[in-house]
Amino acid sequence: MKKVLFILLFISIGCQNNSKISDSLSNKGVGPITNVILEDKVNISMANSGEKLFNQLCTSCHMINEDYIGPAMSGILDRRSPEWIMNMILNPIQMVEEDPIAIELLEKYNFEYMYNQNLLDEEAREILEFFRLID
């Protein structure tokens, strides 16, 4: 009987983790981006432009493979939807006020607010494409 309960508990915990991941991938965030269509292949030209923007604007707080002032960017598309990522780039203040994941991240990273870089939608999309390249 104890063995059966242990197995049920293990399965239950596993399902909760999958549910949390699924919830974070379905969350589109708060902002202007409601739908992003990604091609099967990474657009290298866009990714290169996104890399330049990332290096100019984001590396004071974000690293690729490890947490810094903000979270690491590698694997971001496994944790967040494309819309959420772009809304966080374009609309960080409203995101940390209204989006539960952004609020959780703000708390986790010692209430360090992400700066609004006043990027265009296209520039945020280029950064997203760079994230696809490094994934």
Where are these regions (language model features)?
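Electrostatic cytochrome c docking/interface patches
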Residues: 20-53
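Gly/Gly-Pro-rich "capping" loops immediately C-terminal to redox-active cysteine motifs
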Residues: 47, 51, 63-91
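Axial heme c-ligation environment in periplasmic c-type cytochrome domains
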Residues: 69-76, 94-123
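C-terminal capping alpha-helices of c-type cytochrome domains
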Residues: 83-88, 111-135
